[in-house]
């Protein structure tokens, strides 16, 4: 087959396809005969429906299917022969004029671009590092102790203070009117932990069991309850019970309750450090990977195929609809979500995907089986039964493909960091944990 490719735009191409009418009709006849052997129609026994009746009933739909199949096959063959990397689906239209005995079609489509990655030795990448110090272990230990704290009722004349658990009744009104969520009975919270707004905690702090108090409270403008955000309410609160919190001692008993294999204080701290170091490793990898990807995008030249961008936009819109549906939003499938909201992010994803694919191809950065296995082992190490987790990953090709994609990204990250000008920056454990992504 001689294939003539016409360039319309930067990435847009056109191929004219021709198909013999006889080939189309022969396939239509073949499919109708096959259909006639099994079709059921009133007034006829199965397999005994006359061909002209079958053709009258199903001829149009079968002809449509055959045309789709044959044109699709012809396009795939033509694109392969022309060594074209097609992006998205072609737009195929039948030509008004065709050679005798032929049907002619124009297929307009986009191809994937050539990707030029500039010399990475001139690129700069900031690489973060962080250590797990004793203070991070202490803070984690405090969190674990708080999760296992107990409470004991305080004396009748005791006043509420930080770390106490208080049980209260309260009711709030705005302009003298109650509002949804503004009233509760036997509500418990820990003073000083920020579960309640600061003005609420300040009002309760210093009260005794049995005391009541009224106070004004201003809801922040960005408060999650949109109906009350930015408004001022008047609250009445009554303290019913005050309980002091008691943290467990850091000892062998605490270590044992946490399931530490070496049930000693030293073993507990060592286990915490190991888990924190694993978390630090993954966070650093994610953050440094993002920095590398930003550098790649900034140092690559390519045109974006609109078909790929639109496909990614569609995927993101559907994802947004699914999230709305999960939140219980009515008619989420009909929610007006404009494509343009997601287009910049979709363009970046497509651009990054093409650049990474080219870097992987040009530098043989594909994931090796032993790398995939090592990554799964590392993921499984934090679970109680690592062997079960490993089997879970290897039992599903989709899960393996996800791991393979992560390993490829890690290979790309290591490759770029080995080529670029790396600026090392040390951050504290808390700074790293506070960073997004």
Swiss-Prot record:
The EC number on file is 5.2.1.8
The PPIase FKBP-type domain is annotated at: 163-248
Known catalytic reactions: [protein]-peptidylproline (omega=180) = [protein]-peptidylproline (omega=0)
GO MF annotations, alphabetized: peptidyl-prolyl cis-trans isomerase activity; protein folding chaperone; ribosome binding
Q: Where is it localised?
A: Cytoplasm
* Keyword flag Transmembrane helix: no
Uppermost EC category: isomerase
Identify the InterPro entries for this entry. Answer: PPIase_dom_sf, PPIase_FKBP_dom, Trig_fac, Trigger_fac_C, Trigger_fac_C_sf, Trigger_fac_ribosome-bd_bac, Trigger_fac_ribosome-bd_sf, Trigger_fact/SurA_dom_sf
Q: Which Pfam families does this one have?
A: FKBP_C (PF00254), Trigger_C (PF05698), Trigger_N (PF05697)
State the protein's name.
Trigger factor
Q: What organism, scientifically named, is this protein from? A: Variovorax paradoxus (strain S110)
Lineage here is:
Bacteria, Pseudomonadati, Pseudomonadota, Betaproteobacteria, Burkholderiales
Gene name of this polypeptide:
tig
């Amino acid at each position: 087959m001689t294939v003539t490719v016409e360039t319309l735009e930067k990435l847009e191409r056109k191929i004219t396809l021709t198909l013999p009418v006889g080939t189309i009709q022969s396939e239509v006849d073949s499919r109708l005969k096959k259909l006639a052997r099994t079709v059921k129609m009133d007034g006829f026994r199965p397999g005994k429906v006359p061909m002209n009746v079958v053709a009258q009933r199903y001829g149009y739909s079968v002809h449509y299917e055959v045309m789709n199949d044959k044109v699709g096959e012809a396009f795939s063959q033509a694109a392969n022969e022309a060594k074209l990397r097609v992006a998205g689906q072609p737009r195929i239209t039948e030509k008004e004029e065709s050679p005798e005995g032929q049907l002619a079609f124009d297929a307009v489509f986009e191809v994937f671009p050539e990707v030029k990655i500039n010399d990475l030795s001139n690129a700069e990448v900031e690489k973060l590092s962080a250590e797990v110090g004793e203070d991070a272990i202490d803070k984690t230990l405090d969190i674990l102790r708080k999760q296992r704290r107990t409470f004991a009722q305080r004396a009748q004349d005791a006043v509420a203070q930080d770390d106490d658990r208080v049980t209260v009744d309260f009711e709030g009104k705005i302009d003298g009117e109650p509002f949804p969520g503004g009233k509760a009975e036997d509500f418990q919270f820990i003073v000083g932990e920020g579960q309640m707004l600061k003005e609420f905690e300040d009002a309760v702090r210093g009260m005794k069991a049995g005391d009541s108090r009224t106070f004004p409270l201003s809801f922040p403008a960005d408060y999650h309850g949109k109906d009350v955000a930015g408004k001022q309410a008047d609250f009445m609160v009554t303290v019913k019970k005050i309980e002091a919190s008691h943290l467990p001692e850091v000892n062998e008993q605490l270590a044992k309750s946490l399931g530490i294999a070496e049930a000693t204080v030293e073993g507990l701290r060592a286990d915490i450090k190991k888990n924190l170091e694993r978390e630090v490793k993954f966070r650093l990898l994610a953050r440094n990977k993002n920095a590398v990807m930003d550098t790649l995008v900034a140092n690559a030249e390519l045109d974006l195929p609109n078909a790929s961008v639109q496909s990614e936009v569609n995927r993101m819109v559907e994802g947004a609809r699914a999230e709305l549906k999960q939140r219980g939003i009515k008619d989420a499938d009909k929610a007006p979500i404009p494509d343009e909201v997601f287009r910049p992010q979709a363009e970046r994803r497509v651009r990054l995907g093409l650049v990474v694919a080219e870097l992987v191809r040009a530098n043989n950065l594909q994931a090796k089986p032993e790398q995939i296995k090592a990554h799964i082992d590392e993921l499984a190490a934090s679970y109680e039964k690592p062997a079960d987790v490993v089997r879970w990953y290897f039992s599903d090709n989709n899960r393996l493909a996800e791991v393979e994609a992560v390993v490829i990204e890690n290979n790309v990250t290591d490759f770029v960091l080995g080529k670029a000008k790396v600026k090392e920056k040390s951050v504290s454990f808390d700074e790293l944990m506070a960073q997004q992504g």
